[in-house]
A protein has these predicted regions:
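Signature for the C-terminal beta-barrel architecture of outer-membrane proteins
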Residues: 2, 22-172
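Short Pro/Gly-enriched beta-strand edge/turn motifs at strand-loop
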Residues: 15-19
């Protein structure tokens, strides 16, 4: 499936779009002026790519702050995401987000990461719930940011409509 023009781009269900998403819990959703393509021809696999040149933020047309001009961020971004759900115990995801900001080149960054998540059945009533994710964010093109590592670890249980889990999330 290919799309061109203003669109919402998400690679995970809400609220789990940590880096790329539509900020759907706000009254105004974030959209992208982009070309995107998604391929699901391989079994249990979704391959996605998007080239974005504008991010239409949640703030509306009259917002100017930092890199936001009239509610828009000018960017040249390449978004790559691959997901494989054919594992018996969960879903594996790899991603690379390359962002070059036109009005703040020093903040241009690349984020490369991997995520494994699942909810395998323990028995007929209970599921084990887990997520493990690692990403590294560093400078890209004329960016000058220091590299940062992101870690997420979650473990919990799900019973019927209820779920409880412990999470550890840090970016350093």
């Amino acid at each position: 499936v290919a799309k061109f023009g203003r669109q919402q781009i998400t690679y995970r269900d809400a609220p789990f779009h940590r880096y790329i998403g539509n900020v759907l819990w706000r009254q105004n959703h974030q959209t992208f002026d982009a070309f995107s393509i998604q391929n699901t021809s391989l079994p249990d696999t979704r391959l996605s790519y998007a080239f974005v040149n504008k991010i239409n933020t949640i703030f509306g047309d009259d917002r100017d702050a930092g890199i936001i001009r009239n509610g828009v961020i000018d960017v040249e971004a390449h978004l790559l995401n691959a997901q494989y759900s054919g594992l018996p115990f969960g879903k594996l995801e790899g991603y690379g987000y390359l962002l070059e900001y036109e009005d703040a080149e020093a903040t241009s960054s690349k984020t490369l990461g991997v995520r494994l998540s699942g909810a395998p059945a323990i028995n007929d009533a209970w599921n084990l719930v887990y997520t493990a994710e690692y990403a590294r964010q560093s400078d890209y093109k004329s960016g000058t940011m220091d590299a940062q590592d992101y870690y997420l670890a979650e473990l919990g249980a799900k019973h019927k409509g209820w779920m409880a889990k412990l999470s550890y999330e840090v970016q350093e």
